[in-house]
Amino acid sequence: GSEMCIRDRYSLSILTFGEVIMNKPFIAIEGPIGVGKSSLAHRLSKTFGFYEEKEIVDENPFLSDFYDDIEKWSFQTEMFFLCNRYKQIRDIESLNQGIVSDYHIHKNKIFAKNTLDAKEFDKFSRIFDILTEDIEMPNTIIFLDADLDVLKSRIAQRNRSFESQIEDDYLLTLKKDYLAYYESLKNDGANVIRIDTSQQDFVKNDYDYQNILNLVKPMIGENKDE
């Protein structure tokens, strides 16, 4: 029943994170829509000389329809994202350098849980498990969070037409689910950190960025001080 569903949602966390391989850090940045994942991934990739893995969003042909009618288009939307992210990770597995990604493939299950009915979510989860059973997973995760008003402001600033219809309840649910996922990983001893960015601007403010950098460096085996 619901207990099994909740347990299954987080079952990957135990399998996904082993010991951090310091000679090839693989950082994933996660959090709700508009929190600053891509911006931080870009800065970290420049700082560390890592390959920047960017999530493909605009190319999803179902996305604008999805926000118009979530129930009708959710399965197609989530499957497109899952297959694209699977291919992206496959493409970077042979890289010899560190990687910083603005997503973790597990986000598919977080979003799908909120948009699919029970039958579709079960079907989606089985496909997800098959695709992810043998792919390389991040060994370091940074969870970003921010207050609802901050998220809405940042979403408005980037002016993506299909995001203008996102409702407050949807964002609040994502915030809650990301926090639950973070807690589950933390309890499993994973290499994770959570940063509230409501009062921080790590894009324009170097002091804020340096504070984040000082938290991230020990996670990937680098000295805290430059």
Language model: regions and residue ranges:
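A glycine- and Lys/Arg-enriched "phosphate-lid" helix/loop adjacent to the NTP-binding pocket
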Residues: I110-D177
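Glycine-rich phosphate-binding loop used to anchor ATP phosphates in small-molecule kinases
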Residues: W73, T77-I135
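P-loop (Walker A) phosphate-binding loop of NTP-binding proteins
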Residues: P32
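Conserved substrate/cofactor phosphate-moiety recognition/catalytic segment
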Residues: K46-N84
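Short, small-residue-biased leader/transition segments that mark boundaries at the very start
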Residues: G1-I6
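NTP-dependent small-molecule kinase module
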Residues: A156-Q165, D169-E226
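Conserved lysine of the Walker
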Residues: K37
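Post-Walker A alpha-helix
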Residues: L40-A41
